[in-house]
């Protein structure tokens, strides 16, 4: 008894494969159509050369004319290639300038916006409802103490202060001074 084996390819992959094959077929048809158009255009534009019955001088004149036409076409092709190269360089430079300008202007980091309770209620309920909610009313008020007023500033000769603070003794005084205001 043979057991039917399920396909290992999923449906999405099958769809992708069929789409890719369809696109490849379409590209192939476009390529063939382009080639046929090219052959038709060349047959229309370029008449067949009739070299039978021409003398040596007539053949040489024909060759000179063809060489002159080839030179003109080559010059045009060279000019067009030079223009293309110039344009591609210019496009590349402009792209670099755009990237450079993008890098110069940094976007500021977004900061958290504090919304008051009133504004939040207004946003939720709409502007019609006049609801005020003062959450700060029940809070205690604390006064700030001026630390500068408490400490008297010693004004004196700065040379004495420098001499007194130099060395290990000065370091000890600074350490003791830093301890004393916090302990009170």
From Swiss-Prot:
Keyword line: Acetylation, Actin-binding, Muscle protein, Phosphoprotein
Residue numbers carrying Phosphoserine: 55
GO terms assigned for molecular function: actin binding
Modification type N-acetylproline: residues: 1
Keyword Acetylation tagged: yes
Involved in binding TNC: region residues: 1-45
GO cellular component: troponin complex
Origin: domain of life: Eukaryota
Reported modifications of this chain: In the muscle sample, approximately 25% of the chains were blocked. Pro-1 is probably acetylated.
One GO term (biological process): skeletal muscle contraction
Functional summary from the UniProt entry: Troponin I is the inhibitory subunit of troponin, the thin filament regulatory complex which confers calcium-sensitivity to striated muscle actomyosin ATPase activity.
Entry similarity comment: Belongs to the troponin I family.
Quaternary structure and partners: Binds to actin and tropomyosin.
Protein name in UniProt: Troponin I, slow skeletal muscle
Species for this entry: Oryctolagus cuniculus
């Amino acid at each position: 008894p043979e057991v039917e084996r399920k396909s290992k390819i999923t449906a999405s992959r099958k769809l992708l494969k069929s789409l890719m094959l369809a696109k490849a077929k379409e590209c192939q048809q476009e390529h063939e159509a382009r080639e046929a158009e090219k052959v038709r255009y060349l047959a229309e534009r370029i008449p067949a050369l009739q070299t039978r019955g021409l003398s040596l001088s007539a053949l040489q004149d024909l060759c000179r004319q063809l060489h002159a036409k080839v030179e003109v076409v080559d010059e045009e092709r060279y000019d067009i290639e030079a223009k293309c190269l110039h344009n591609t360089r210019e496009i590349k430079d402009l792209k670099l300038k755009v990237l450079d300008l993008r890098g110069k202007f940094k976007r500021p980091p977004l900061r958290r916006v504090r919304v008051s309770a009133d504004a939040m209620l207004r946003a939720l309920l709409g502007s019609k409802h006049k609801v005020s909610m003062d959450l700060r009313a029940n809070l205690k008020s604390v006064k700030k103490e001026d630390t500068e007023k408490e400490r008297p500033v010693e004004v004196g000769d700065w040379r004495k202060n420098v001499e007194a603070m130099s060395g290990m003794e000065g370091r000890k005084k600074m350490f003791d001074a830093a301890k004393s205001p916090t302990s009170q």
